[in-house]
């Protein structure tokens, strides 16, 4: 199964999952041969892409080759970012924007779909939990949010740079606190919180974009005033900092830590749904949750009742999409199920 943009669909392809309009209307059932009329209909209903059947063995082989290239590039990029950080911290030299973001943008551009991006990052982040890897992930995810928001290339590059440098202040936090394998004490958390101010102070020594400095300072601020270091509310938080905040929280929650496993993406979405409206930029958070959930359409998941299913449709309750059970192809609308939800993406 693979995702194909509607403008790249060809007659004769076969749908892998049911195709729904953005409003939930069934347009074409799965296992149907796509006609020219169907393609025109998809365009009429503003359907951007559909999932079509393909050779699973061939797809797996192609993805494995692609992933191997991305994995090697990712590792090299982390090494390069480490050198850039050393330049900034110890040599008082900061690379130009294009040099800094080159690796991040190149990795981003290798992904054809958002599912590929999240699937690859989910695997890569399990092998590297360093601040450098987190910064690379935030840069990539934040750029995707910018693309979804329709921002121009100049603004996307600003976002990529802000993501890479947002946590630079952590290098001034003692390792025994930063890497502590357990819950921080109140006093230790107060020390951790200082990394935002430290980051701004470090970057303020250089002639770089103000948005990069502000993202380092404000990426833990929340729209309702519950964040730090200043307890700012919406009117004092710029868009780039708000985007970095969402990407930062998502990557942190889905990443493995020494004291816990990474959370299932749909559990993270549920957490965002619970208090996201008040804490995060309303322009980006709803779009982000819908797009992330939609990225997993066609994916196989494990439900909390132990059964395996395939996601076929995202409802207004993004954390609880509609699925078909693999055992009998019956449809289960998770938003109507109180005791069943997605436990893991397989």
Residue ranges and their predicted role:
Residues 58-190, 203-206, 211:
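Acidic/His-rich, divalent-metal-binding segments that scaffold phosphate/diphosphate chemistry
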Residues 314-346:
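C-terminal accessory subdomain/extension
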Residues 168, 173, 216-231:
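Short catalytic-site patches enriched in acidic/histidine residues
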Residues 103, 124, 159-162, 195, ...:
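Short acidic/histidine-centered micro-motifs embedded in hydrophobic/aromatic stretches
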Residues 1-99, 328-333, 338-340:
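Membrane-cytosol interface segments
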Residues 33-35, 167, 313-315:
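A residue-level detector for short acidic-glycine micro-motifs
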Residues 42, 180-198, 222-325:
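Divalent-cation-assisted or electrostatically stabilized phosphate/pyrophosphate-binding catalytic cores
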